Amino acid sequence: MANVKVTLKDGSVKEVAAGTTLLEVAKGLSQKLGKQALLAVVDGVNKDLTDKLEHDASVEFVVPESSEGLHAIRHTAAHIMAQAIQHLFPDTKFAIGPAIANGFYYDLDIEHLFFPEDLIAIEKEIAKIVKANLPLVRSELPRSEALKMFADKDEKYKVELINDLPEDAVISTYTQGDFTDLCAGPHCPSTGRVKAFKLQSIAGAYWRGDEKNKMLQRIYGTAFPSKEELDAYLHMLEEAARRDHRKLGKELDLFSIMEEGPGFPFFHPNGMVIRNELINYWREVHRRYGYQEIKTPMILSRKLWETSGHWDHYRENMYVTEIDNEDYAIKPMNCPGGMLVYKTHPHSYRELPIRAGELGLVHRHELSGALHGLFRVRCFTQDDAHIFMMPSQIKDEIQNVIRLFDEVYATFGLKYHAELSTRPEDSMGDAETWETTTNALKSAMEDFGLDYVINEGDGAFYGPKIDFHLTDSIGRTWQCGTIQLDMLLPEKFDLTYTGEDGLKHRPVMIHRVVYGSIERFIGILIENYAGAFPAWLAPCQVRVMPITDKHYEYAKKLSDEMFKLGLRVYLDDRNEKIGYKIREAQLQKVPYMLVIGDKEVEDGTVAVRRRGEGDIGAMKQEDFIAMLQEEIADKK
């Protein structure tokens, strides 16, 4: 039998007999790899380990620690859960059961209504199936045979899925023990590879997401390569629930979402303090980095949105009105207005770069089911900036933006990583321009010392972009900042500048946001800090608490002095026990509490309690004020 050449990830080449399975190749490399491998990527395509090599190929084995490995574990876990449900509830009809970002689910058609106690029983059955270590066997069937098999089982959803496949589609099933499911795969070699799992919740879901179809029951779960990783993830979920910005937003009286305005946040006085501090900081930083601030109207003519392309490509997300018998739209983006500001007068190369920032309120229609606190809303303030420049200035400007982003995120203690998205298939512009601009982004990041990963073909059709993903205090990532090169809008709006040669030239433009959305960024900060904001952001920075009425005058004078200095101080002069006052201040996550009793009045001091630490001792009034002012100024 002829041999085939296998090119491995490290570039080495191994010869094996044609017809050798991928699992055999893995075992031939090492017993450890043979035990760990879940899948193999053959010439860029994920394959089961039972697949045979019939020709030369590049092969990379997928292990549990990789993202592909985790996806395979969760995909297989969905099948195991379905098998367990079939054992316990034989009348169940199965719809779809994919792996998703943080786990898996299966949509089920069954008269029995699932309750949390059912999940416990299903988990026990899953454990039996995992322990049995059943092999998952792939089969490819003719369409007619596949249709008959699932029709005989009265699996109408599978029949519908098969009928929707193209005539030339490969139809495959996976069998583990007594359970067979329609699936393209690939899967783990056996059920025993799913080492740690947890069923999490029950929800409703319309078949194919269409409310005209039947409502099915959906069971969510997750799976990990080890119990330690599962436990860490479940702990993170518990911590995330404790930090939920919707819960804390209510407890700390920051914002609310009313039924009279779903998706339109109401900010309360405490929330406005945080919002205004973020805006003040944004303005201070941008002034230092050479930005000018503009403001464009919220409602603009349909003609503008036709020029920008939004009317044709974004119309379903826009709120439209009629004024003087003409169509207008509430802006979903700030960019077109920024183009009009640039065009108000001619520009010379000597003026470039022009950095124009805008804190613009935009409105976008979101389906009600997608709304989520401050994270997914219908109106938000986007901290846009548009930078107009010559091609020769791209690299320097990108670095300038990265430097600004780095400073801002460091202020909040947020680490980040960058992702570069490159030219998609449906791009505009020529290959040379794309290569030049993409290389400028790469060079800017590399010279700055910024590590990045590349998302091939994931850029916008009008230019490459860099996305900044922030990591919060419990390890979750949030995409916030974006640097987007745009070769389309300057063309559409016929933007020009006069070059050194006296001729008209087209400027290059960068869109960029650092917060992304102020509302969403506030939500992220609430959860990152668990509501315990640093002093510079805290709605109330210090509470002054006299123990009895005889300490009131001293406390009042101190409070007034701090108020005059611009500190956010609250005098708690209620007729309550001091322990109660302290407890309430702790629940409100106030950074500092000043307790005033006989000794403090006599000595001209304050008894200082710091959030999270408790009593830190007595201080002179002026020393405490100086300490707090320094902490606020340093944004600690």
Predicted regions and their residues:
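NTP/phosphate- and nucleic-acid-binding module
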Residues: 1-75, 80-93, 100-101, 107-636
